[in-house]
């Protein structure tokens, strides 16, 4: 559902169902933005972000952290995540966050 929503807005979307698949996708191409669910099968989204940053040193890739956990804000702060969305979330909230973060990254790249 998430990828369909973002594709409708014109974004190229790559999905992964677990941490190892996500890391393999990042090896092929570093994303412009990541939407990461804190609760992933086997390993969690926090582990993925730590490993992603350790391997590729890409602190400038914006991240939206999805979680039903009330601790998501603390986790996001600890990981340097730009934005969080509670689960369940409204599609329009995700769209606004993605648009804002993509625009911010583009303006930084141009300066």
Which functions belong to the PLM regions below?
Residues 90:
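Receiver (REC) domain switch/active-site region of two-component response regulators
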Residues 29-35, 40:
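Active-site beta3 strand of CheY-like receiver
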Residues 15, 40-43:
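Residue-level signal for the "D+5" position in two-component response regulator receiver
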Residues 24, 46-59:
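Short amphipathic alpha-helix used as the core "switch/output" element in two-component signaling
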Residues 1-14:
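Two-component/phosphorelay signaling modules centered on CheY-like receiver
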Residues 18, 44-47:
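Acidic catalytic/metal-coordinating carboxylates
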Residues 64-66:
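Hydrophobic/aromatic residues positioned on beta-strands within the core alpha/beta folds
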Residues 47, 69-86, 96, 100:
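Alpha4 helix (beta4-alpha4-beta5 surface) of REC/receiver domains from two-component response regulators
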């Amino acid at each position: 559902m998430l990828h369909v929503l973002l594709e409708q807005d014109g974004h190229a979307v790559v999905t992964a169902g677990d941490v190892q698949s996500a890391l393999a996708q990042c090896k092929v191409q570093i994303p412009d933005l990541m939407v990461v669910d804190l609760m992933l099968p086997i390993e969690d989204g926090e582990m993925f972000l730590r490993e992603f940053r350790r391997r590729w040193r890409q602190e400038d890739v914006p991240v939206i952290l999805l979680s039903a956990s009330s601790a998501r804000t603390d986790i996001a702060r600890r990981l340097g995540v730009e934005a969080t969305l509670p689960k369940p979330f409204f599609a329009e909230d995700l769209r606004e966050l993605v648009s804002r973060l993509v625009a911010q990254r583009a303006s930084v790249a141009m300066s």
